[in-house]
Amino acid sequence: MVVPALLGTILGEWQSSIGIYLAFVGMSLTGYIMNTLGEKSPLNLKQSSIVVVLSFVLLSLFGSLPYLYINPFWEGIDPFALFASSFLESTSGFTTTGLSTITHPENLPDSFSFYRSYTEWVGGLSFVYLVMALYYPETKLAGMKYFLGSGILRFKQLLSTISIIFVVYTTIFVLLIFTFGHINILDSISLSFTTLATGGFVPTSTILNSENSITLAIIMGGMIIAALPFAFHFGIFSKNVEATKEVKEILIFLIILTLFIFLFMLIEPSFSESD
């Protein structure tokens, strides 16, 4: 979270960066206190589930601080609506849901727009699992790997898979969007972040217009790749035959995706007529 805060500092967007710094400091202190005072005992699947849920709740609460500080919604918003909207945006980011009530993100400071996409990217990076791996030995995390879509890989191998997906793929899609989409580098990074989180927090409301067909194609390809199981990516990069046995699931996913594409193509004219 310190990355978008530093970006805001460099760009001179102090209001945005201060809010993000507050979230970073609060999250770091809370994590340190809980890790210091908490008991490190072996985690079963039920306990792992509770830890993951509570971790995302805390992430979302602290992640809402920049929204509360900058108020990117509308003037005159009451405090309860401001908190609810901020918490919604933050939760939507860290859970990679991508749901947003901000209709014109292009009016936001560049660093804050980057922050929104960054929270989605961090959520897709399975930030909670990475933090857990730093503080707990692998023998105590046996139940955690099932959250990541595979029972055949060791937890450390899954972390390597996540790193490969989000570092290599992010770099590739930043270059593709910047080169062929004719979008500035900062928006290209933000768009790449949200693409690998399967969409949602775009930096501008017009970036996905139908005229940008090349950009749309790159984004769609990125979202499909990001939706594939972690174990499949691990098998591709490591040439592990056992890890690529999920081809049947992937085929079913692609068939369902194709059916819904045709369904929306059939429905789309009715929407046009209603407009």
List the predicted regions and their residue ranges:
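Membrane-proximal intracellular helices of multi-pass ion channels
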Residues: 1-275
